[in-house]
Protein backbone atom coordinates (compact mmCIF):
# COMPACT_ATOMS: atom_id res chain seq x y z
CA UNK A 1 0.00 0.00 0.00
CA UNK A 2 1.27 3.48 -0.75
CA UNK A 3 1.96 6.03 1.97
CA UNK A 4 -1.10 8.07 1.00
CA UNK A 5 -3.36 5.13 1.78
CA UNK A 6 -1.75 4.42 5.15
CA UNK A 7 -2.52 7.99 6.24
CA UNK A 8 -6.23 7.13 5.97
CA UNK A 9 -5.86 4.40 8.57
CA UNK A 10 -6.33 6.85 11.45
CA UNK A 11 -9.57 8.74 12.10
CA UNK A 12 -10.58 11.29 14.75
CA UNK A 13 -14.10 11.87 16.07
CA UNK A 14 -14.89 15.14 17.82
CA UNK A 15 -16.71 14.60 21.13
CA UNK A 16 -19.76 16.91 21.50
CA UNK A 17 -19.67 19.46 24.34
CA UNK A 18 -22.07 17.86 26.82
CA UNK A 19 -20.95 14.25 26.26
CA UNK A 20 -18.59 12.31 28.53
CA UNK A 21 -16.68 9.42 26.98
CA UNK A 22 -14.48 6.94 28.83
CA UNK A 23 -12.74 3.75 27.84
CA UNK A 24 -12.53 0.83 30.27
CA UNK A 25 -10.59 -1.98 28.63
CA UNK A 26 -12.44 -2.66 25.38
CA UNK A 27 -15.71 -1.12 26.61
CA UNK A 28 -16.51 2.42 25.44
CA UNK A 29 -18.94 4.24 27.76
CA UNK A 30 -20.81 7.31 26.45
CA UNK A 31 -22.88 9.54 28.74
CA UNK A 32 -24.97 12.56 27.74
CA UNK A 33 -28.06 14.57 28.68
CA UNK A 34 -30.52 11.87 27.52
CA UNK A 35 -28.79 8.93 29.20
CA UNK A 36 -25.81 6.65 28.96
CA UNK A 37 -24.86 3.71 26.80
CA UNK A 38 -21.87 1.53 26.03
CA UNK A 39 -20.34 -0.52 23.22
CA UNK A 40 -17.92 -3.43 23.46
CA UNK A 41 -15.03 -3.21 20.97
CA UNK A 42 -13.29 -6.41 22.10
CA UNK A 43 -13.77 -8.29 18.82
CA UNK A 44 -13.35 -5.26 16.56
CA UNK A 45 -9.71 -4.81 15.42
CA UNK A 46 -9.42 -1.07 16.09
CA UNK A 47 -7.15 0.79 18.51
CA UNK A 48 -9.14 3.42 20.45
CA UNK A 49 -7.59 6.35 22.31
CA UNK A 50 -9.40 9.24 23.98
CA UNK A 51 -7.75 12.66 23.94
CA UNK A 52 -9.20 15.87 25.41
CA UNK A 53 -12.03 16.46 22.93
CA UNK A 54 -11.37 13.73 20.35
CA UNK A 55 -11.63 9.97 20.04
CA UNK A 56 -8.80 8.65 17.88
CA UNK A 57 -9.32 5.37 16.02
CA UNK A 58 -6.48 3.53 14.35
CA UNK A 59 -6.80 0.46 12.17
CA UNK A 60 -4.66 -2.52 13.15
CA UNK A 61 -3.83 -3.38 9.54
CA UNK A 62 -3.32 -1.72 6.17
CA UNK A 63 -5.71 -3.70 3.98
CA UNK A 64 -9.05 -2.61 2.61
CA UNK A 65 -10.82 -4.81 5.17
CA UNK A 66 -9.29 -2.86 8.07
CA UNK A 67 -10.20 0.45 6.45
CA UNK A 68 -13.83 -0.71 6.21
CA UNK A 69 -13.79 -1.81 9.87
CA UNK A 70 -12.30 1.56 10.84
CA UNK A 71 -15.13 3.46 9.13
CA UNK A 72 -17.76 1.15 10.64
CA UNK A 73 -16.31 1.78 14.11
CA UNK A 74 -16.33 5.53 13.48
CA UNK A 75 -19.99 5.34 12.46
CA UNK A 76 -20.88 3.29 15.57
CA UNK A 77 -19.23 5.80 17.91
CA UNK A 78 -20.81 8.75 16.10
CA UNK A 79 -24.23 7.07 16.45
CA UNK A 80 -23.68 6.58 20.19
CA UNK A 81 -22.73 10.25 20.65
CA UNK A 82 -25.67 11.50 18.57
CA UNK A 83 -28.08 9.28 20.51
CA UNK A 84 -27.17 10.53 23.98
CA UNK A 85 -27.42 14.16 22.78
CA UNK A 86 -30.41 14.16 20.39
CA UNK A 87 -32.07 10.75 20.71
CA UNK A 88 -33.87 8.81 17.98
CA UNK A 89 -37.55 8.69 17.02
CA UNK A 90 -39.54 6.32 14.81
CA UNK A 91 -43.15 7.04 13.95
CA UNK A 92 -45.31 4.04 13.02
CA UNK A 93 -48.78 4.12 11.48
CA UNK A 94 -51.61 1.70 12.36
CA UNK A 95 -53.46 0.64 9.21
CA UNK A 96 -56.55 -1.59 9.27
CA UNK A 97 -59.45 -2.38 6.96
CA UNK A 98 -62.33 -3.52 9.20
CA UNK A 99 -61.40 -4.39 12.78
CA UNK A 100 -59.93 -1.38 14.62
CA UNK A 101 -56.54 -2.23 16.09
CA UNK A 102 -55.71 -0.90 19.55
CA UNK A 103 -52.17 -0.66 20.87
CA UNK A 104 -51.43 -0.57 24.60
CA UNK A 105 -48.20 -0.47 26.58
CA UNK A 106 -47.89 -2.53 29.77
CA UNK A 107 -44.48 -2.40 31.40
CA UNK A 108 -41.89 -3.62 28.88
CA UNK A 109 -44.49 -5.10 26.50
CA UNK A 110 -46.54 -3.66 23.64
CA UNK A 111 -49.98 -5.29 23.33
CA UNK A 112 -51.65 -5.28 19.91
CA UNK A 113 -55.35 -5.97 20.52
CA UNK A 114 -58.20 -6.82 18.13
CA UNK A 115 -55.76 -7.54 15.30
CA UNK A 116 -57.81 -9.10 12.46
CA UNK A 117 -60.60 -9.59 14.99
CA UNK A 118 -58.48 -12.00 17.04
CA UNK A 119 -59.52 -12.40 20.65
CA UNK A 120 -55.96 -12.96 21.88
CA UNK A 121 -53.56 -10.04 21.73
CA UNK A 122 -50.14 -10.06 20.14
CA UNK A 123 -47.16 -9.15 22.32
CA UNK A 124 -43.97 -7.32 21.32
CA UNK A 125 -41.02 -6.54 23.58
CA UNK A 126 -39.71 -3.04 24.33
CA UNK A 127 -35.92 -3.03 24.31
CA UNK A 128 -34.05 -1.47 27.27
CA UNK A 129 -34.72 2.28 27.80
CA UNK A 130 -36.92 2.75 24.72
CA UNK A 131 -40.27 4.52 25.22
CA UNK A 132 -43.38 3.60 23.20
CA UNK A 133 -46.37 5.96 23.15
CA UNK A 134 -49.51 5.10 21.15
CA UNK A 135 -51.43 8.20 19.97
CA UNK A 136 -54.56 7.43 17.96
CA UNK A 137 -53.45 5.74 14.73
CA UNK A 138 -49.76 6.44 15.42
CA UNK A 139 -47.19 4.66 17.55
CA UNK A 140 -44.16 6.79 18.45
CA UNK A 141 -40.97 5.05 19.57
CA UNK A 142 -38.20 7.15 21.13
CA UNK A 143 -34.90 6.38 22.81
CA UNK A 144 -31.22 7.24 22.92
CA UNK A 145 -29.83 3.94 21.57
CA UNK A 146 -30.48 3.48 17.84
CA UNK A 147 -30.35 -0.33 17.88
CA UNK A 148 -32.92 -0.55 20.69
CA UNK A 149 -35.32 1.87 18.98
CA UNK A 150 -35.13 0.12 15.62
CA UNK A 151 -35.37 -3.36 17.16
CA UNK A 152 -38.52 -2.37 19.08
CA UNK A 153 -40.05 -1.02 15.85
CA UNK A 154 -39.08 -4.19 13.97
CA UNK A 155 -40.72 -6.43 16.58
CA UNK A 156 -43.96 -4.44 16.47
CA UNK A 157 -43.95 -4.54 12.67
CA UNK A 158 -43.25 -8.28 12.51
CA UNK A 159 -45.92 -9.13 15.09
CA UNK A 160 -48.56 -7.34 13.05
CA UNK A 161 -47.65 -8.64 9.62
CA UNK A 162 -50.21 -10.63 7.63
CA UNK A 163 -50.06 -10.76 3.85
CA UNK A 164 -52.41 -8.27 2.10
CA UNK A 165 -54.18 -7.29 5.33
CA UNK A 166 -53.97 -4.92 8.32
CA UNK A 167 -50.61 -3.95 9.73
CA UNK A 168 -48.59 -1.46 11.72
CA UNK A 169 -45.81 -0.06 9.55
CA UNK A 170 -43.06 2.55 9.82
CA UNK A 171 -44.29 5.83 8.35
CA UNK A 172 -41.32 8.04 9.27
CA UNK A 173 -37.89 6.41 9.46
CA UNK A 174 -35.29 6.93 12.16
CA UNK A 175 -33.68 10.32 12.45
CA UNK A 176 -32.15 12.14 15.38
CA UNK A 177 -34.74 13.88 17.52
CA UNK A 178 -33.77 17.48 18.14
CA UNK A 179 -34.39 18.85 21.62
Regions found by a protein language model. Name each.
Residues 18-20, 45-47, 100-102, 131:
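Short, surface-exposed charged micro-motifs
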Residues 135-167:
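Mixed-charge, glycine-accented linear interaction segment located at domain edges/termini
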Residues 29-78, 82:
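Acidic (E/D-rich), amphipathic helical modules within compact regulatory domains
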Residues 24, 35, 78-85, 89, ...:
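Signal for well-folded cores of large energy- and translation-related assemblies
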Residues 1-42:
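N-terminal, positively charged regions that mediate nucleic acid binding
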Residues 37-42, 121-127, 146-147, 151-153, ...:
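Extended intrinsically disordered, low-complexity coil regions enriched in Ser, Thr, Gly, Ala
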Residues 59-142:
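Extended, positively charged loop/linker patches that create polyanion-binding surfaces
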Residues 168-179:
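Single conserved hydrophobic/aromatic residue that forms the stacking wall/gate
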Amino acid sequence: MSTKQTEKMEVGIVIPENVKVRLAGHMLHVEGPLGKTHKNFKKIPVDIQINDDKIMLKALGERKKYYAILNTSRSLIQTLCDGVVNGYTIKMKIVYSHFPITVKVEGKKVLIENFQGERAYRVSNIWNDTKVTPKGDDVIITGHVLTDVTQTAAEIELNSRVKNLSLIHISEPTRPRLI
